[in-house]
Amino acid sequence: FGLVMHQEQNPKNHITIDSIREFRELTEIKIKSKGSGLFMIGGGVPKNFIQDTVICAELLGKEVEMHKYAVQISVADSRDGACSSSTLKEASSWGKVNVTKEQMVFAEATSVLPLIVSDAYHRGEWKNRNRKNFSKIFG
């Protein structure tokens, strides 16, 4: 409601959230990338959008590979409909994620994310990588 009020009070100069543009930009990143993987905290709409970049790219006539891997941290369980019955295994059936490299982490993110990030940092694999600036692809 806050953004609606903001737009009403500032009809000529206001903030707009454009989810279609954002999805198109995510799809452009997927199309231009050599490969991709997903690291998702939680689920819902953002998870669905990022997974669907593969399908959107194909609908635009572009050949793209599935996301090479996916990790999702969530307390949601498909048994009660909390994750819309949309597990990573389901994502592989649509050609979104390579099923051989997917892992659901059923945990509360604030308890396990620091452990995962700390492990990744201390392994040091990032030290020899070139820094990315994805904003350049929108030129």
Locations of regions flagged by a protein language model:
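Gly/Ser/Thr-rich active-site loops/lids in small-molecule metabolic enzymes
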Residues: 11-25, 56-75
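C-terminal functional extensions of proteins
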Residues: 35, 45, 59-139
